[in-house]
Amino acid sequence: MTPLRFPSNLPLRAVAFDEDQSMPHRRPIDAANDFVRRHIGPSPQDIAAMLATAGAGSLEQLVAETLPYAIRHREPLKLGAPLTESEALAHMSELGAQNQVFTSLIGQGYYGTILPTVIQRNILENPAWYTAYTPYQPEISQGRLEALFNFQTMICDLTGLDVANASLLDEGTAAAEAMALAERAAAKNAKAFFVDADTHPQTIAVLRTRAEPLGWRIIVGNPETGLEGADVFGALLQYPGSSGRLSDPRAVIAALRKKGALAVVAADLLALTLITPPGELGADIAIGSAQRFGVPMGYGGPHAAYMAVRDSLKRSLPGRIVGLSIDSHGQPAYRLALQTREQHIRREKATSNICTAQVLLAVINAMYAVYHGPDGLAAIARRVHRRTAVLAAGLQQLGFAPTHGNYFDTLTIEVGDRRDAIVARAEAENINLRINASSLGISLDETTTPATVEALWRAFGGSLDYAAVERDAGDALGTALPAALKRTSDYLTQPAFQDYRSETELLRYMRKLSDRDLALDRAMIPLGSCTMKLNATTEMMPLTWPEFGSLHPFVPKAQAAGYHALFERLETWLAEITGYDAVSLQPNSGAQGEYAGLLTIRGYHLSRGEPHRKVCLIPSSAHGTNPASAAMAGMDVVVVACDAHGDVDVDDLRAKAEAHSADLAAVMITYPSTHGVFEEHIREICDIVHAHGGQVYLDGANLNAQVGLARPGSYGADVSHLNLHKTFCIPHGGGGPGMGPIGVKAHLAPFLPGHPAEGEPLNGGLHGGGTVSAAPWGSASILTISYIYILMMGAAGLKRATEIAILNANYIAAKLHPHFPVLYRNPRGRVAHECIIDPRALKTSTGVTVDDIAKRLIDYGFHAPTMSFPVPGTLMIEPTESESKAEIDRFCDAMIAIRREIAQVEAGRYPIEQSPLRHAPHTAHDVTSAEWTRPYPRTEGCFPAPNSRTDKYWSPVGRVDNVYGDRNLICSCPPVEDYALAADYARAAE
């Protein structure tokens, strides 16, 4: 892809690094603070007015009243002065130039691909798509829900299975999720899982890491011979194998079924356009990566993984599932289905902590399939396979026979002591190969040309002509795909994959979908505990440059020098910001960060000869991923009570720490708390746990209230994960990607995650904290976003952002308190960066629910706050520092107007069932309907605020019927329109 560049006259050498490599420095100029001004919403005049409303004389006074004195960090962060946007881009260009973009034919789950420019511009680079939140509010998420529905349909069709989820984090973790599903669903009570030795090494490493704390044994071997007599609950088969081997797994799958074990197939999606899909082979579960459907390798990510299952396993499927339901008008509408089966809701009973996905990447994958259609995908697959066959024919002429006669796109060649010479010649051709002990692997892809194949032949010591080799090979080129495995079933026959083949039609389809959604490009998203702040355009630009996007994660380190300079500096900055001593960038979500952090604690206790330390104390207010992650790490959860103020009950914590002193592993605590308050006793909590031999895991979800003001590692925490997609500006992407790196104190550093690509042992041992993600540095390419954010903000800018985040939350609390009680405050009457309002008494008096308030906010043009977490029946509001006073006032005005509407119900003007609250959201169908029988005017329902008439967001559907959707589960196409009549019939039958 062609990178969008900045003016060529920028002085690239104007940016230098301090000796400590902490931050570029330059001569200060007034423009240095320009980005900080643009990132922060309120103007100086607004700040003064908001402080007055909040009852504070200055930001310093407000901060002093908000944070406990004992945790304040008084010294400026050692990050240096900020760069301007143009200087930052120049610096990123220099970093990118240090990366060498070779043609990487390493394979192993990562392949060159071509992202259609129409998708790059209108999805990947479009804030309407990348700034949206997870589609928990379906009425304002219909566009991306339809795109995810297409993704699920694509996965179901290609795998031949019944139900697919809306993506997972990467292939390695998808395999681990499949293993956990198999253990739960298998007919037998075995404690071992078989893994095909021809599975990608990073997948095996992730499986070993996941299995070890749970007491499961991983058996790696040849499934055709090693399964006999093995007592297993399931097996993973790579299809085609990591070495390229393509064999028929039907007999192995049948043998597994006889044992009462489940068959998991890790399948290549492009290959599945030509070979028999896993479902037709008898597989129970299929997993894999969708990366090669248009998403650059990005030095490891982000990429969408997939999982599909047979119908009987759908309620055990991890992650999110998009389903089709109906709205209040009986029209088709998408929603997230079967949400009560999501693992974070199951808390300590969970077998997974998955609560996210890779939505933006899955949307790209789906649009790639829409763009190419089934014929186009098959044509790409045939071209890749044919060029692989021509390559094999030429290698045979040169005396190198592929190890396997049947393959799709990957060859393994035994080369013996000629390996190093061949590798050197390949590198001279700017080609990377997969290097094994005595063999070389070559994986071709969509970007491979005849010239690439000829360069490979030169690396192997010959000079051959592609056209001549292809002509001479003749019919022999068609023998590498065995007849028994050739696909005969149709796929992607639905209109979505047929109707948008011209760029004009595809462009309009993507625009139509984005117009249905409400993202940050249209309005404030006040979700508590989500930190929906600005994702600045400059931060996003380097992401699509080839210098960052085109690197395979397993290239020689010297080819990724720019990336590694970025990693080193980012780790240093994050350590400085948090007060920790070491950082791992591998976890590719917040939940993965939790898991990795707990594994460091587990490893620490094991190293001290204390394997019995397994008790993890978790407050009752914790997010469900906390107990789920603890369960995955092999820990036993003990719940700690919260007091009437929402704080951890220190007496209960002390009693439980004493009761479990001999076995205490850790406490998991969120700070500021999930109740939106800085608890006064955080140091005491840390001291209590340490006194009983435990470690303190501090959940970094709310770090946006601490940066520059407090450092977890300085007030007693031992480890935290950091949500870069919250505090450090990686966009939420409609539900992913995210990044959850962890910071640790020095004594936990030896137990940070490792990776096979970095020398991890593959013999069943685990070094450090094992391997938690498929790639060594997780979703490396989006680290550029957080890096450039810190680069442009500097220490003072980051601190000011935190102060304004706290101000905005306290301003909202002050404005809304006369209308809705603010549930929790600290002893000085302050909230942190978010606040919880409590309408529960109104439900008692009028019947109004938080759902009614959330849906009515759509009519005012807003996404709802976080509903019923951490307290059922309440709303948690987080404005972030990026929202202006004008937008915050607009939101507060909407909430106050809704309170007046509730008062109308209280006064008896209309019952709640006939109120604009219960009928919300109001659609164009409502305002144009021939009949209007409601006891309030159309204008009151549809245009409740002054801006509604000039800048109206129309929900494309009425309120979605969740119960109907779960009772009539539909998770893949036929097209939406076909279900309108079915919905009518269903209602008539009721």
From Swiss-Prot:
N6-(pyridoxal phosphate)lysine found at: K726
UniProt GO BP: glycine decarboxylation via glycine cleavage system
Keyword GTP-binding: no
Signal sequence, renumbered to the chain: none
Alphabetical keyword list: Oxidoreductase, Pyridoxal phosphate
Family matches, as Gene3D superfamilies: Aspartate Aminotransferase, domain 1, Type I PLP-dependent aspartate aminotransferase-like (Major domain)
Gene Ontology cellular-component annotations: cytosol; glycine cleavage complex
InterPro entries reported for this sequence: GcvP, GDC-P_C, GDC-P_N, GDC_P, PyrdxlP-dep_Trfase, PyrdxlP-dep_Trfase_major, PyrdxlP-dep_Trfase_small
Domain of life: Bacteria
Alphabetical list of Pfam families matching this protein: GcvP2_C (PF21478), GDC-P (PF02347)
Assembly: The glycine cleavage system is composed of four proteins: P, T, L and H.
Family as reported in the entry's similarity comment: Belongs to the GcvP family.
PANTHER family in the record: GLYCINE DEHYDROGENASE (DECARBOXYLATING), MITOCHONDRIAL, GLYCINE DEHYDROGENASE, DECARBOXYLATING
Entry function: The glycine cleavage system catalyzes the degradation of glycine. The P protein binds the alpha-amino group of glycine through its pyridoxal phosphate cofactor; CO(2) is released and the remaining methylamine moiety is then transferred to the lipoamide cofactor of the H protein.
Identification of the protein by name: Glycine dehydrogenase (decarboxylating)
Organism whose genome encodes this protein: Rhodopseudomonas palustris (strain ATCC BAA-98 / CGA009)
